Amino acid sequence: MFTLPQKDFRAPTTCLGPTCMQDLGSSHGEDLEGECSRKLDQKLPELRGVGDPAMISSDTSYLSSRGRMIKWFWDSAEEGYRTYHMDEYDEDKNPSGIINLGTSENKLCFDLLSWRLSQRDMQRVEPSLLQYADWRGHLFLREEVAKFLSFYCKSPVPLRPENVVVLNGGASLFSALATVLCEAGEAFLIPTPYYGAITQHVCLYGNIRLAYVYLDSEVTGLDTRPFQLTVEKLEMALREAHSEGVKVKGLILISPQNPLGDVYSPEELQEYLVFAKRHRLHVIVDEVYMLSVFEKSVGYRSVLSLERLPDPQRTHVMWATSKDFGMSGLRFGTLYTENQDVATAVASLCRYHGLSGLVQYQMAQLLRDRDWINQVYLPENHARLKAAHTYVSEELRALGIPFLSRGAGFFIWVDLRKYLPKGTFEEEMLLWRRFLDNKVLLSFGKAFECKEPGWFRFVFSDQVHRLCLGMQRVQQVLAGKSQVAEDPRPSQSQEPSDQRR
């Protein structure tokens, strides 16, 4: 398999340098401003976080109010993803199809994973794997999960298998936790921008709301970085929710953060947990990217590494293989909580969100193979992630586009505000549609409830030829020259320099 070589990464010869940026921004901005003004009266569809589910409407008479809300999410929030799957790029069958730089998946290590999952020790069928199991998961798997998390989270004491529940993915974990922790209409605090699908996870079953903790790109006051979360901002958001009559039951934290890539320090984690204890709030900590920190200078620490949790009965940690092991299709996620009432309630919902016995066996085999993980998979995965991140970063710098440079996750938070003349979400949506029309799917800031229009998430964890082609199509849109770029590679070439016109 071709590994993205860092030394081969160069800015494309077709990139517009800094001297061109003023003209590029000006001509495109005037065009976008005119198009936006023509469409303002048409009321573009809006992607909302569920501040108030009652705002969602649908005309169908066949569905319950809950069903109408679920259908609304499918019709609106999934538009780009559905469009992509109807016109998916294939270098042989559909070279002018859509390049997906919007979905956060790791597509860099299929060769390593396919080899490991096809080994003989993965192939086992016995009666116990074909029958109903403990809804928390087979004991052999929960034991391996506890050992795995103890090692990689650097827990000061061994984690216990009785505190582990396994489900079919992180989405199910969010849904189950929200349902068992909150009454309908209650809320979780969540810093924004945040992984927008959490809105669906907590709302579609449990009708749980999200109370936003808005973060700013400007560094002000005591902040030391853009979009910094502080206890003061948490307190303010909590007061605002209470003033609106919303009961807040918990706080959702993501570390490494999606879409920012930020990693919370142990001191920050402790401050957030103390805040939550003070207000008797549950804390859901999503650490699904914990093994995808590819810069050695980034000092990642799991919440489970803390010597003492301020409120262990209200602290619930999530992890899954979908990101760190590039297995979003296998649907494996795990919850670690010391609260046995919560664990039992979530386990009961595993009747609807459980894993097959065969998948549980494979996951146990994978997680116990510490030699392969440490000596083969993680070093190579980190090297490929770093190389891909370097390439996209250099492309953005060549275009004079600001972005947050972090060393974790699969994405870069990109600032395209200068391409929005009036700085509106309508313009952001129009720019997103231009990207999609030019066959490149990105994620726009409103989908993450970013308060400032013009931010986009670029996913870089993909093969080099798709990254090159996707960035070429992005450049065409920003230059006001939208046209579908096809893969110009010779059939045997894999070098970035040979993939550009």
Swiss-Prot record:
Name the SUPFAM superfamilies on file: PLP-dependent transferases (SSF53383)
GO molecular function terms attached to this record: identical protein binding; pyridoxal phosphate binding; transaminase activity
The keyword Transferase is annotated on this UniProt entry? no
> Is Ribosomal protein among the key words of this record?
no
Positions of post-translational N6-(pyridoxal phosphate)lysine modification: 323
Q: Which InterPro entries match?
A: Aminotransferase_I/II_large (IPR004839), Ethylene_sulfur-biosynth (IPR050478), PyrdxlP-dep_Trfase (IPR015424), PyrdxlP-dep_Trfase_major (IPR015421), PyrdxlP-dep_Trfase_small (IPR015422)
Q: Which residues bind substrate?
A: 105
Segments of this protein annotated with the region Disordered: 480-501
Q: Which Pfam families match?
A: Aminotran_1_2 (PF00155)
Listed A to Z, the keywords are:
Pyridoxal phosphate
Q: Name one GO biological process term.
A: amino acid metabolic process
Which stretches does UniProt call biased (Polar residues)?
A: 490-501
UniProt function note = Does not catalyze the synthesis of 1-aminocyclopropane-1-carboxylate but is capable of catalyzing the deamination of L-vinylglycine.
> What family does the Swiss-Prot or TrEMBL record give for this protein?
Belongs to the class-I pyridoxal-phosphate-dependent aminotransferase family.
The protein depicted here goes by the name: 1-aminocyclopropane-1-carboxylate synthase-like protein 1
